[in-house]
Amino acid sequence: MARVTVEDCVDKVPNRFDLVLLAAQRAREISGGAEMTIDRDRDKNPVVALREIAEQTIKPKDLQEAVVTNLQKILPDDDDEFDEVGSLSQSAEALRITASAPTRSTSIGADFDG
């Protein structure tokens, strides 16, 4: 069981923060049942993920795409059209007009016989 350090992986993924995201993604994949590309050697999933990155048995680009896909709140549909920009700008214009309109008086005036 060899020790894996960040320095072993930095030449493959230069940004340490990206390395953490990619290793965490790969560790989640392994926990979910993905096949490991190296022997486990009694290591836990995050260590296995770092070892895979260090030994270049997994592509960081593939992990990066998986990270982006998992972080997306709205997945694009295949039948989406590009004319939605027009409707968005129309909605923004309608909101601007509504916001600039004078407010109605909602106070209860002398007409109220309470």
Curated annotation (Swiss-Prot):
InterPro entries found in the cross-reference section: DNA-dir_RNA_pol_omega, Pol_omega/Rpo6/RPB6, RPB6/omega-like_sf
The EC number(s) attached to this protein equal: 2.7.7.6
The domain of life for this entry's organism is Bacteria
The record's Gene Ontology biological-process terms are: DNA-templated transcription
What's in the GO CC field? DNA-directed RNA polymerase complex
Which enzyme class? transferase
Q: Which residues cross the membrane?
A: none
Which Gene Ontology molecular function entries are recorded, alphabetically? DNA binding; DNA-directed RNA polymerase activity
Q: Which reaction does it catalyse?
A: RNA(n) + a ribonucleoside 5'-triphosphate = RNA(n+1) + diphosphate
Alphabetical UniProt keywords: DNA-directed RNA polymerase, Nucleotidyltransferase, Transcription, Transferase
* Family named by the database record: Belongs to the RNA polymerase subunit omega family.
Outline the subunit composition: The RNAP catalytic core consists of 2 alpha, 1 beta, 1 beta' and 1 omega subunit. When a sigma factor is associated with the core the holoenzyme is formed, which can initiate transcription.
Known role: Promotes RNA polymerase assembly. Latches the N- and C-terminal regions of the beta' subunit thereby facilitating its interaction with the beta and alpha subunits.
- Name under which the protein is recorded: DNA-directed RNA polymerase subunit omega
